[in-house]
Amino acid sequence: MNESYRCQTSTWVERGSSATMGAVLFGAGLLGNLLALVLLARSGLGSCRPGPLHPPPSVFYVLVCGLTVTDLLGKCLISPMVLAAYAQNQSLKELLPASGNQLCETFAFLMSFFGLASTLQLLAMAVECWLSLGHPFFYQRHVTLRRGVLVAPVVAAFCLAFCALPFAGFGKFVQYCPGTWCFIQMIHKERSFSVIGFSVLYSSLMALLVLATVVCNLGAMYNLYDMHRRQRHYPHRCSRDRAQSGSDYRHGSLHPLEELDHFVLLALMTVLFTMCSLPLIYRAYYGAFKLENKAEGDSEDLQALRFLSVISIVDPWIFIIFRTSVFRMLFHKVFTRPLIYRNWSSHSQQSNVESTL
């Protein structure tokens, strides 16, 4: 057998490995996503009944719900297999020996599926935010609730077809050290195009999605900054323009403090998302194009995969918990109240000077 990985055929968990990190990631992801769903349900954002007490959910929150459910399903389907392997001290291939390599292939398929699906949904949220802030006319005409609901099933169908390519012969799933996880094979001794090509294609697609998400978030951040700057210099004109443009569909009636909320939210999201995605992309390219065909970096691959899994943990805390009224009230008291007082003082001094003139 043409083995490129040290634990490719292992039947036990490598010595020195601990389930602590996997358990912590699973617990944090499960708690965060469940709390996010509870907050969504309590806020009534899941109700589609029109009316003053039950307003229809916005496209943004429909996308948040889809992302939260996707992350929760990924944690519940993938992490128990890792913890079971540690508990039994058996690799994924040995947990169900009668199934052969099917459990390992299923695990790798789920890993690639949920990693790609979450990234696509994050891009959809970034595009929605950028359009709503920078192109309100186009947003109000073309971005509808019905189309927002279709994002999750369309993403799932695409990821299902793309990540199933190794089952059709293009690409290969393999077991990585310490024997508790499987993923796309990124190194091959004979440099088979069907094996290396799929890993490069997957990482290239992830890189393009990350780049597009960062660009959209930077565009949204610039629009927020521009809105805040225009409102400071021309407050009456900005309010009149927003009312005429109809851009208050979602963000048009933003208070300056809410604009600051969105700015900080997008900045934090962009930094964390980029930091968590780049390690796996780098490892895929490194494994495909390095001169030596040995997989001596199994520990680095595992760390890169853990970084990628952190995205599904951070998502609910960033998109939902950060936006709750309690957290925002605390944020305003700590960070924005001095800013408000400073702006009010400067405005009062300017008014006094103008009155004396």
From Swiss-Prot:
Explain the consequences of disrupting this gene.
Answer: Mutant mice show decreased susceptibility to passive cutaneous anaphylaxis associated with decreased mast cell degranulation.
The listed locations are: Cell membrane
Residue spans, topological domain Extracellular = 1-20, 80-106, 171-194, 283-306
Tissue expression, as annotated, is: Most abundantly expressed in the ileum, followed by lung, stomach and uterus.
Span of the secretion signal? none
Q: Which Cys-Cys disulphide bridges does the record give?
A: C104-C182
Per the record, the similarity remark reads: Belongs to the G-protein coupled receptor 1 family.
What name does this protein carry?
Answer: Prostaglandin D2 receptor
Q: Which organism is it from?
A: Mus musculus (Mouse)
